[in-house]
Every structure is written in structure tokens, then in C-alpha cells.
């Protein structure tokens, strides 16, 4: 279904409402930028990687339910190829971290879940069909992680890897480890680590998405009517127009900064505003309306209202899908691997109340090796923030390096 004009108008109205509601929490202000066009606006991921002097590969993998996913790989850094490079799997992106890890000697894989701009194909279904988009992050947990991790290990001839997740990439791994012991054993090694940034439940979300939840999400049918039952806000529609005609101009920079603030959290002054046009031409990366409903919690028993991480709620049809009235819960207390958490109080999509009130108490204490609370970060700063390299990526690299040393010298 084509994005309805009413949904665009409603999006604009909600932006105004959100702006008014969060002004007490965030000062929205313009940042001077250059009008120069950045060529990365029209590049795909491999082209951007090549532009910075790194090799890039595209790898297709078919899931058990026949979705065709595309991973991106940086097999080595500027030092050139070498054998037996440890594998690190990034879900999703984490911007410049891919180059930091490649230069540090890692074989870097960038995952793309179904519905993402690079993972919208199927052996049988037409990507334009409603059937193709009939998924939420449940299917990513069940099928996509298996397919991508297995392929990365196979290609690199390794038996284990390091996983670094952000946002949905963290939530899906937590869910996978809680549910699938075979997968857990498959990737487990003596010092297994999952390094996670910016994710939890979304009961205490703030900003524009909170407004959407309050105003729209009591009626599933209305939400589907508004946005369709296929792809949620196609990537090359609204946001590309904003990037092309607004973010490049000095006058429009404030609008783009404010839009990020209203969604992601208080402006931390970490974003390089000269790259706003690049950021907005590559977001949103694409997903289904059903996945947004799962995240935003349309039904009263979904995550926003309950604060519990569970599978998609089909309402009266739960009995049909699950054989029970309530959807199954992802019990993260079953996760049994070393976990390194990086989070921040100003992240409106992974709120402090959700992190400290649900996630940390739910995880077993012996597995939470490091719990890092960052100040003056918001949700998007983990990817694009100018302090992310020093305060997030390098500590992650240090943790992995220490682990590799312990594997080489088990008595250390």
C-alpha cells in the first residue's frame, strides 16, 4: 500500500505535538553547516566502505523460511589480508566502528535483517506483496540470526565470533539466547561475549514515539489503514525528500536536528551536522508495519504497556498461533554468556527506567561483566556520535582484545 497522504499529515501534526511535549527536556537549536553535497548520499554501503579505502563484499544468505538476506563484509583493514582473523558481527552498522575493528585485525560482518534496504528478497514471495512483509522481530530472532551467523563462521572458517548489537540488534540477540540453546552452544566459547548498546524493553519510551503509542496504537486496524500492511514508510519516500531538500540547507539543518532529537533523545551536541544529509538518505533502513506494531505495542498486553519482552500479540488469535491466550515471553534470565552493556539515561528508546528496572535485574548477575552508563549520549549517538569511538568502540575493542589474550594464554 502506498503511504497515504493522511499519514504524512498526521506525522507532521505529531511532530508538532511531540515538539511541544519535549521542549522541557530538550533544547532544540540550529547548528550551522555547509551547503556542500556529500557524495555518500547516493552511495550504498559497499561504495561508502570502498570510498574510505577498505575492501567490501556483499554476501547473500537464505533463511530457513526462504528470505534472502544480504550481509556486508570487510575482510581486513588497511594493513591488508592475513589468515585466521577473529570474526566480529555488527548488528546493525555502528557506523565508524566497522573501520576501527577492521584496522584492529578483525574480519568484520555487518548484518541486515529482513525488510532492511539490503535484505528484501525471497525465493518465492514478491517483496511488493503483503505476504513478504508479514513479519516482526520474532522472525528475525528465529531465522535471521541463525542464517547470518552461520554464514559468517563458514566463510571465515571460524568456530566462534564476537557479537556487537545496537538497539534491535541487541534485543534480538537477547531473545535468541533466551530461547535457543542450540544456537547458544553453536557460538559459545570459553570467554563468549555479547556486547550490547542501547536496547531494552520500551515501556518507558519518550518523545515522538511515545506520542505515537498514546494517540494511535489502541487500534491495530486503524494503524494498518494509515500506514498499510507492507513496508513501514518506504526508505526512498519521505526521508529522502527531507534529506535532499531540507537537510542540505542551512535553514533546514535545525529541522533535521530537531527531528532526530524528538525520536532519539536529548540533543547531546555529538552529531556532525554536516553529514545530516547522509544520515537522512540512509534512514529508515526499512522494516514492516507489523514489526513497528510489535515494537510500539499496539495491544494493551504488548511491551509499551506491560514492560515485558514477549512475542507478537495476535489478540484473540493467540490460541491459533501459540496454543495459549498470551504470547510467549522471552526470558532473558536464561541468557548464559558474558554481556557488556553500554547505555545512557538520555536515550528515549532504551530508557534508564527500562534498563535499571527490567533488563539488568532480569539478567543473571554473573553474566553482566560490564555495565557502562554513559552521560550526554542519546540513542543515535552510539552510531553517529563524535564521542562514540573513544567511549564505546574502543572499550569494546579492549574487552575483546583481553578475551583473545585469555584464549591464547588460558592461565592468565
Mark where each language-model region is:
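Short beta-strand/loop motif that positions the catalytic acidic residue
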Residues: 335, 341-343, 347
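Conserved alpha/beta-hydrolase "acid-adjacent" motif
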Residues: 348-354
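Catalytic active-site module of serine/aspartate enzymes centered on a nucleophile-bearing elbow/loop
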Residues: 367-412
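Alpha/beta-hydrolase active-site loop
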Residues: 130-155
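Alpha/beta-hydrolase-fold enzymes
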Residues: 21-24, 154-159, 170-314, 319
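Gly/Ala-rich beta-loop-alpha elbow adjacent to hydrolase catalytic centers
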Residues: 164-169
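Short, surface-exposed "cap/lid" segments of acyl-processing enzymes
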Residues: 48, 63, 68-125
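Cleavable N-terminal signal peptides of Sec/SRP-targeted secreted and luminal proteins
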Residues: 2-20
Amino acid at each position: 500500500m502506498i503511504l497515504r497522504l493522511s499519514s504524512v499529515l498526521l506525522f507532521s501534526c505529531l511532530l508538532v505535538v511531540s515538539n511541544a511535549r519535549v521542549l522541557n527536556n530538550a533544547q532544540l537549536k540550529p547548528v550551522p553547516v555547509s551547503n556542500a553535497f556529500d557524495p555518500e548520499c547516493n552511495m550504498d554501503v559497499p561504495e561508502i566502505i570502498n570510498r574510505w579505502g577498505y575492501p567490501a563484499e556483499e554476501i547473500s544468505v537464505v533463511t530457513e523460511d526462504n528470505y534472502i538476506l544480504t550481509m556486508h563484509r570487510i575482510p581486513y583493514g588497511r594493513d591488508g589480508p592475513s589468515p585466521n582473523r577473529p570474526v566480529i558481527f555488527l548488528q546493525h552498522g555502528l557506523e565508524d566502528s566497522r573501520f576501527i575493528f577492521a584496522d584492529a585485525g578483525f574480519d568484520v560482518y555487518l548484518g541486515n535483517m529482513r525488510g532492511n534496504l539490503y535484505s528484501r528478497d525471497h525465493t518465492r514471495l514478491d517483496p511488493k506483496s503483503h505476504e513478504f512483509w508479514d513479519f516482526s522481530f520474532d522472525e528475525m530472532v528465529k531465522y535471521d540470526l541463525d542464517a547470518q551467523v552461520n554464514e559468517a563462521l563458514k566463510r571465515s572458517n571460524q568456530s566462534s565470533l564476537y557479537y556487537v548489537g545496537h538497539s534491535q540488534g541487541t534485543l534480538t540477540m537477547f531473545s535468541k539466547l533466551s530461547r535457543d540453546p542450540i544456537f547458544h552452544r553453536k557460538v559459545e566459547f570459553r570467554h563468549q561475549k555479547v556486547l550490547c548498546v542501547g536496547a531494552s524493553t520500551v515501556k518507558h519510551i519518550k518523545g515522538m514515539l511515545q506520542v505515537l503509542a498514546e494517540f494511535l496504537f489502541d487500534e491495530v486496524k486503524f494503524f494498518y489503514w494509515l500506514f498499510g500492511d507492507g513496508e513501514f514508510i518506504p526508505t526512498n519516500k519521505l526521508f529522502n525528500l527531507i534529506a535532499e531538500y531540507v537537510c542540505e540547507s542551512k535553514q533546514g539543518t535545525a529541522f533535521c536536528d530537531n527531528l532526530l532529537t524528538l525520536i532519539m533523545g536529548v540533543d547531546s551536541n555529538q552529531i556532525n551536522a554536516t553529514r545530516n544529509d547522509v544520515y537522512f538518505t540512509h534512514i529508515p533502513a526499512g522494516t514492516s508495519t507489523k514489526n513497528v506494531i510489535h515494537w510500539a505495542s499496539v495491544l494493551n498486553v504488548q511491551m509499551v504497556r506491560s514492560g515485558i519482552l514477549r512475542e507478537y500479540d495476535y489478540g484473540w488469535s493467540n490460541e491459533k498461533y501459540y496454543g495459549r491466550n498470551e504470547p510467549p515471553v522471552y526470558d532473558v534470565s536464561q541468557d548464559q554468556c558474558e554481556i557488556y552493556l553500554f547505555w545512557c539515561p538520555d536515550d528515549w528508546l532504551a530508557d534508564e527506567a527500562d534498563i535499571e528496572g527490567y533488563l539488568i535485574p532480569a539478567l543473571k548477575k554473573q553474566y553482566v561483566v560490564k555495565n557502562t552508563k554513559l552521560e550526554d549520549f542519546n540513542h543515535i549517538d552510539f552510531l553517529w556520535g563524535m564521542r562514540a569511538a573513544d567511549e564505546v568502540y574502543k572499550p569494546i575493542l579492549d574487552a575483546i582484545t583481553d578475551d583473545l589474550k585469555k584464549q591464547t594464554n588460558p592461565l592468565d
